[in-house]
Amino acid sequence: MRVSESGFSLRIRLVLRGTRGEPTLIEGMKADSLECVPAPTAGIMKHGLEGGGEIQSLAVDLDHGKHDAKAVLKDGSLDPRPYFSKNFYELDEGESVVYEVLVLTRRQCRWRLAVQVRSGETTGTVHVDDVGAPFLASSVVWDRSGQNLGPYRTCLVSDNETGYIDRGAGCRQ
């Protein structure tokens, strides 16, 4: 089980590597295959994902818009324009780029990342998931009485064998 306790967010480190003889252009990134339900009342915890190389920070809001990756501004807000509408990245064969994607939600959502790429005249989408399963991001609601719906904490949950549950230290305020 993976968790971020940074308040409505999850960070995923994504390493993309060029594998073709000609350059590959990264043209877009967004959350895809999105399925959301209200947040559960629970808590789970796990270490973050790792990657190497220079890191480009992006954010995806699963609760608003078209779920395109956007730049995080210095004040912590999101640029209203999709990041790749003005920041294409060209990968040569063997070259890598690392994106740290901050995922925001107040619900529980299953999703994958869809990276739009072009190599020569060929375009396509590379789907990124959690070892074959969709990512599961969730905000946790600790009080469903109707009087107080906060505080929220955000968790990312993965069903793969590297996860674990910590019953004493889950997403608590």
Where are these regions (language model features)?
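Acidic, serine/threonine- and proline-rich intrinsically disordered appendage/tail regions
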Residues: V60-G76, R112-Q173
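A surface/extracellular/periplasmic glyco- and lipid-processing/surface-interacting theme
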Residues: T24, V37-L49, I55-S57
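Short, hydrophobic/aromatic beta-strand segments
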Residues: E22-K30, P40-G43, K70-V72, R112
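Asparagine-centered strand-capping/turn motif at beta-strand->loop junctions
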Residues: L14-R20, V103
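Short, solvent-exposed loop/turn segments enriched in Ser/Thr/Gly
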Residues: S4-I12
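Intrinsically disordered, low-complexity Pro/Gly/Ser/Thr-rich segments with frequent PxxP/GP/PP motifs
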Residues: G48-R107
